Regions:
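N-terminal targeting signals for export/organelle localization
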Residues: 1-89, 234-235
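Short loop/turn microsegments at loop-to-beta-strand junctions
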Residues: 87-88, 109-110, 196-197
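Hydrophobic beta-strand positions
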Residues: 91-92, 201
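Short active-site neighborhood of thiol/selenol oxidoreductases, capturing the structured segment around
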Residues: 100-123, 129
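Hydrophobic beta-strand anchors of alpha/beta hydrolase catalytic cores
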Residues: 111-112, 144, 199
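Structural microenvironment flanking redox-active thiols in thiol-disulfide oxidoreductases
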Residues: 123-168, 178-187
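Thiol/disulfide oxidoreductase modules built on the thioredoxin-like
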Residues: 167-169, 176-230
C-alpha cells in the first residue's frame, strides 16, 4: 500500500472542473438505435434504447440508463469510499449508434476514461493514452473504454464525435446523456465525476480499484494502473 500511495502522489493531476456548465432542456425524441452491436469485449450489447436529442446539441448527447448504486462524488484518491464497490451498469450507445453496456459483470479489468471535448487536460491526456496503446504497455487483459461527457456546444472542439476522431481515439466510447431533472451528465454523475479527464479502474470482479482526475504522463499512468491491478507487496 505504501508504494501505491507513492505512485499516486507522484502523478501530477491537473483537471478541468465541471461545475460551470449550462445545460439546455428543450428535448425531442427520435427512434431507437438500430446499428450493429459492438464486437469489443470491454462492453456488451444492450437492447435498443430511445435516443433523446437536446436543442443545440444535435446527436452529441444520447440516452443513458443507470442500473445499480451510483458511486459517491470523487474527492480524494487516498481515502476514496468507492474503492471495492461495484460500478453501476451504464447502458447507452456510441456516436455511431452502436448499443453499449458497461457494467460490473466482466472477466477482465477495465479502465474507464471520462473525457470532455473542451478540456485542455483531456486534449493533453489522449496522446499519452495513445502512446501507451501504440507501445502495447497496458497490463495484460486490460480493456479501455471512453465516456464522452460534459458536452457543451459553445465550447472548443464541438462536436465531440469529430474531436475523438481527430485525436485518434480508437477505443470504444459511450456518449453521455443529460438528466433533465437534476441537470447532470448521467454517466459522469453515476461514476462520481468531479473533473476531467476522470478515470475509474475496475478489476475483473467489477469492483473499483481506483479513481483519479487529471492528466498524467504515460509512464506514470502505466505505473499507477499496473500497481492497482497487480498490487506489489509492501516493503
Amino acid at each position: 500500500m505504501r508504494r501505491l500511495l507513492a505512485v499516486i502522489a507522484a502523478v501530477a493531476f491537473t483537471a478541468c472542473a465541471n461545475d460551470d456548465l449550462v445545460i439546455v432542456f428543450d428535448t425531442t425524441t427520435t427512434s431507437p438505435a438500430t446499428s450493429a452491436p459492438s464486437t469489443t469485449s470491454a462492453v456488451t450489447t444492450s437492447p435498443s434504447i430511445t435516443t433523446t436529442t437536446i436543442a443545440g446539441y444535435g446527436d452529441q448527447v444520447r440516452s443513458v440508463m443507470v442500473d445499480g448504486e451510483a458511486l459517491p462524488a470523487f474527492v480524494d484518491s487516498h481515502s476514496d469510499p468507492a474503492i471495492g464497490r461495484p460500478i453501476p451498469t451504464l447502458t447507452g450507445e456510441g456516436y455511431d449508434g452502436t448499443p453499449i453496456t458497461i457494467g460490473p459483470d466482466r472477466t477482465n479489468p477495465m479502465l474507464l476514461v471520462v473525457l470532455a471535448h473542451w478540456c485542455p487536460h483531456c486534449n493533453n491526456e489522449i496522446p499519452e493514452i495513445n502512446a501507451i496503446r501504440d507501445a502495447d504497455r497496458w497490463p495484460d487483459g486490460l480493456e479501455v473504454v471512453g465516456i464522452s461527457s460534459a458536452i457543451a456546444p459553445d465550447r472548443p472542439n464541438f462536436p465531440p464525435a469529430r474531436w475523438l476522431v481527430e485525436k485518434d481515439w480508437t477505443y470504444p466510447v459511450l456518449a453521455d446523456g443529460i438528466d433533465e431533472t437534476r441537470g447532470v451528465y448521467i454517466a459522469g454523475d453515476a461514476l462520481g465525476v468531479t473533473g476531467y479527464p476522470f478515470m475509474v479502474l475496475v478489476d475483473a470482479t467489477g469492483a473499483v480499484r481506483g479513481r483519479w482526475s487529471g492528466e498524467s504522463p504515460a509512464d506514470a499512468l502505466v505505473a499507477l494502473v499496473t500497481d492497482l491491478i497487480n498490487p506489489p507487496a509492501d516493503v
